[in-house]
Amino acid sequence: HVDEYMLRFKKTWEKLNINYDDFIRTTEERHTCRVKEVLLFLKDKGDIYLDEYEGLYSVSEERFITERESEEGDFKEVKVLKEKNYFFKMSKYQKELIKHINDNPDFIKPSSRRNEILGFLKRDLNDLCISRPKSRLSWGIELPFDKDYVAYVWFDALLNYITSIGWNTNNN
């Protein structure tokens, strides 16, 4: 299914005379191997842990949603789901992120977005769920430390910004 869309996008870009220097898919080895390296690095630092999570789950969107989203959104099927997953200790880096952004005013532009991010970071920051059990989601990058789980797409896709430019290879 995704392969079809990828071809459609490429054909559309060609018709619109849109060019790109590099086209990367998150299923490519140059991406998946770097994601596994990051996961192992974070796990070895103690920044990834296994815990149980319970929350509202949108079956159609294949993601957990907040109470507010459930009330305001148009979700076809929502259920309470309880499962074990791996989490990244994002809360551990909250103060460091705030300091970095304050010490480097040009780090986030425009300034309105910088203020928005700082406002977000000044509230309690929850740890980030970064996995899904294979029993529920079979596709994805397998966690290098637990074959029963895959990396959640919104974690691995963010790493695409650095894997696509050759981060942590001999090419940079």
Question: Where do the PLM segments sit?
Answer:
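A glycine-rich helix N-cap at a beta->alpha junction
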Residues: 9-19
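N-terminal glycine-rich dinucleotide-binding loop that anchors FAD/FMN and/or NAD(P) in oxidoreductases
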Residues: 1-2
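Metal-ion-coordinating, acidic/His-rich active-site neighborhoods
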Residues: 67-69
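Short polybasic/polar patches that bind polyanions
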Residues: 14, 43-44
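Structured secondary-structure scaffolds
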Residues: 22-26, 30-41, 53, 57-61, ...
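A short, conserved structural fragment
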Residues: 47-49
